[in-house]
Structures are given as C-alpha cells and as structure tokens.
Amino acid sequence: MIGREGERGRLSAFVTATEDQALVLKGETGVGKSALLDHVAEAATQSGHEVIRAAGVEAESGLPFAGLHQVLHTLLPAVERLDEVHRVVFGTAFGQSCGRPPSVMALGIAVLDLLGQASAARPLLLVVDDGQWLDAASTEVVGFVGRRLAGGAVRLVVGLRSEVASGWDTAGLPELPVPALSDTAAQELLDLRHPDLDASLRRLVLDHARGNPLALLELPAHLHRVGHQGTGERASAGIQLHGLSLTVPRRLQHVYGTRIAALSDRVRGELLRGALDGAGATSAPGSVPGAGRLPGAVRYRMRDA
C-alpha cells in the first residue's frame, strides 16, 4: 500500500495495544479505508486473533438492530450460554420474542457479556466497514461497547466515510484520519498501475484525482474509453476529459459528488451552468456559450452525483 506507512504502523500497533481498543478510520470515499481494514484484519489473524467482519448496508440503515445482528451473527449461537436476562434482551432486540426493545445500556451490557465469552479462548477483533450505514440503534450499541473494551481481549475497528454524517460522529471513540495521498505517493501509485500514460493524461489524472487512490486507479481507463468515443483526436478528447462532461463510473461519482456537495450554493450553481452550457475556463470572452463544444444531446445528459 503506497503512501500508507503511517496508517499501517498505527493499525499494526493497535492489534496488540492495551489501551484504545476501539478505533475509527475516517476518510472520503475511495481513499483506501477498506484496504487498511484488510491490513488490520491480516495483522490480527497473524497474531492469533479471531476476526469477525461486517459491513454496513445502506438498504438496512433504517432497520433497528440490523447492523448489530450482522456484526454478531456468527456469535449468536453462544447466546444460549448467557444468563436468562441477557438471553431475553437479545431475543427482544432481534425479534425472537415479544416485548419492548431493550435500552442501549441493557443491550450493550449483554453484547459485552457475549463478547467476553467469545474471547475467552483467543482474542477477538471486530471489523466493521461502511459503519456510516449501520442503523442508528446499532451504532449506539456498538459505540457503547467500544467505549468499554479497555483491558479486555476484544478490539473493534470501524471504517467510515467522512462525508456522511452518522451517530459515530459523537461516539467518542479514538479516530485515525485517512487523508488523500501525498503528491509523491499519488504519482508513485499512478506510475505503478498505469506506467504507459502519456504526460498530458498523467497530469490530467493527477489533477482530478487529488490524491484519491480510487480515482488514480480508475480514471485512466475511463478517460481512455472516453477518448476513443470522441473524434479520435487527442486534443478533442482532452477538452472533453478536462471538463469531465461525460458520465464517470458510479464509484467515482461518489468521490466527486461529495466534493461538489461541499461547495457553496453559488459555486455549485456556476458549475451546473457551465456543465449545461458546455462552456468552461477555455471559452473566449464574448464567445457564445457552448459554441464548438459537445452536441446538445450529449452536453445536457446529466446524472446525479
């Protein structure tokens, strides 16, 4: 993993640390959080941990305790070995018995009991990717548990998209920011994965990717395809690509969509008008908006980011 030596070191140390046994990784879409979660899972496996992985699903983000059910799914058979109070708590939380939903504290304590039993023979690492999509009830319970892991044999690491607000923002767990790659690391990654890019496309990708590994890996192939869909002339393709006026892959839409969402209303309005016009910074003063640019059928084809 190019440019992630610091983060990898922190995560490797986290596996054996006696303090801060819960950690939240935060970064924008495509910045490499999942790869870092793979790293900490591998490090934990090599050090003798049992690793349980889960991932938030946006479609289930409105279902109370759905996320917690996924996190604990492989451990649920052991609920039968808990005391009756905790068995009832789990039963009502997961719809196996009637009753009022348990409080965060009641369910959190039951989860701690279950995790304590599960980690009696060997230490346990819980890895949750896309934690921003956990339902609110599960986020509260997992956060409650994460704040009470110190000194035990259980560790928790959660990956979050920094641009999506969630209950994790106030969970009070230690955070490890995952920033964009440095210019040097971005160039190294691009040259390693796309060594045959010509200088102009290389510069274009670096400028638009802004250190985002997903964009660095996927933009070159996309821009190459877009270029071949145009007139076949590099200059013409370059104008289209520089404006990013054609549809980009869905995964990259999340990257650029969140950046656009962070802009002011005025700036977003100017971007929208420029996109609809087909006009950009290269338009000459007094020129007709969109003149000499993409035909209207293409120019006005838009998709939500």
Where are these regions (language model features)?
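A short hydrophobic beta-strand->loop->alpha-helix junction that borders the nucleotide-binding pocket
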Residues: 26, 52-61, 161, 178
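N-terminal pre-P-loop "Q-motif" helix
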Residues: 1-12, 107
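Walker A/P-loop nucleotide-binding motif
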Residues: 22-37
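Amphipathic alpha-helical scaffolds
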Residues: 201, 266-270, 277-305
